[in-house]
């Protein structure tokens, strides 16, 4: 292990500090975006939309078509097995 007097230690220290600072900035941006999303959902709720359903729609839209169809088929199978379909 290198002692604290080698030139590489300073470089590693600077790189580590840079990485940590970048992560901290991104975490701040992530928190700001999460707050913005929360405000949009609050606006939607104020306009009479069901936020739970909106979240489900957003989650479904992220899926590709095949994945969505597979999950819908499994859900239909389970509901049918329970006599709910």
From Swiss-Prot:
HAMAP family: UPF0335 (MF_00797)
Lineage, broadest ranks: Bacteria, Pseudomonadati, Pseudomonadota, Alphaproteobacteria, Hyphomicrobiales
Tree of life domain: Bacteria
InterPro entries, per the entry: GapR-like, GapR-like_DNA-bd
Organism: Parvibaculum lavamentivorans (strain DS-1 / DSM 13023 / NCIMB 13966)
Protein name: UPF0335 protein Plav_2034
GO molecular function: DNA binding
Pfam families: GapR_DNA-bd
Family: Belongs to the UPF0335 family.
């Amino acid at each position: 292990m290198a002692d604290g007097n080698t030139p590489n230690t300073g470089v590693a220290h600077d790189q580590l500090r840079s990485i940590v600072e970048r992560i901290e900035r991104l975490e701040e941006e992530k928190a700001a975006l999460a707050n913005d999303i929360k405000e949009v959902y609050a606006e939607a709720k104020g306009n009479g939309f069901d936020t739970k359903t909106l979240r489900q729609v957003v989650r479904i839209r992220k899926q590709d078509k095949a994945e969505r169809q597979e999950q819908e088929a499994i859900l239909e199978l389970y509901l049918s097995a329970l006599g709910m379909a």
